[in-house]
Regions:
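Membrane-embedded alpha-helical hairpins and interfacial helices in multi-pass inner-membrane proteins
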Residues: 89-168
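Central hydrophobic cores of alpha-helical transmembrane segments
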Residues: 11, 47-57, 93-102, 167-169
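Interfacial aromatic-anchored transmembrane helix boundaries in multi-pass membrane proteins
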Residues: 17-28, 52-84
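Hydrophobic alpha-helical transmembrane segments
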Residues: 5-10, 45-49, 69-73, 94-98, ...
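Helix-boundary and loop/linker segments of multi-pass membrane transporters
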Residues: 1-5, 24-25, 85-86, 121, ...
């Protein structure tokens, strides 16, 4: 098995395990892996497959509900940010990580509000929902920053150490 396939399998397993192991709310590598797979994969379909596979694998244990579709959509936005930031350097990666975090926050909190189960279907209800999501966003952003640095930084270190990694995975 070539390095690229092993890399993507490792990403799927890392993300699935991180979602299953105890962790602070929203502190997972999901968005960072979506960003990295979108950025690094030669084909967009590979980034999408890696990200959705990681979610689906962990959801076999965690369960899948109506709101899960919004988490999947937010993860695909991270893949899109990865594709957009390709070949644009570190600043673009940082912007992609921030954009991924914000998109996850807005998509998932909007879904909670739109479900009508916890908040009234008014602008005040939407504002209350977003306000209640801020503590979760702090963990989301911290996790995205940590894992983006670890994954992109770790890959850069590996790339320097091993010549065959200079090709896109």
């Amino acid at each position: 098995m070539d390095f690229g396939k092993r890399l993507w399998i490792a990403m799927v397993v890392l993300c699935a395990c991180a979602r299953l192991l105890p962790h602070p709310w929203n502190f997972t590598p999901l968005m960072a892996i979506g960003l990295f797979s979108g950025y690094q994969a030669a084909k967009a379909s590979t980034g999408i497959l890696v990200t959705l596979s990681a979610l689906a694998l962990s959801d076999l244990v965690l369960g899948f509900d109506r709101g899960s579709w919004f988490v999947y959509a937010a993860a695909l936005v991270a893949v899109l940010f990865g594709r957009i930031t390709r070949n644009h350097g570190v600043g673009a990666i940082v912007a992609g990580a921030l954009g991924s975090s914000l998109s996850f926050f807005f998509i998932t909190n909007f879904m909670v509000w739109a479900s009508g189960r916890l908040y009234p279907s008014t602008l005040a209800g939407l504002a209350a929902c977003f306000a209640a999501g801020v503590p979760f966003y702090q963990n989301q952003f911290a996790g995205d920053a940590f894992y983006t640095l670890a994954i992109f930084g770790g890959y850069a270190l590996l790339k320097r150490s091993f010549r065959p990694l200079h090709q896109a995975a």
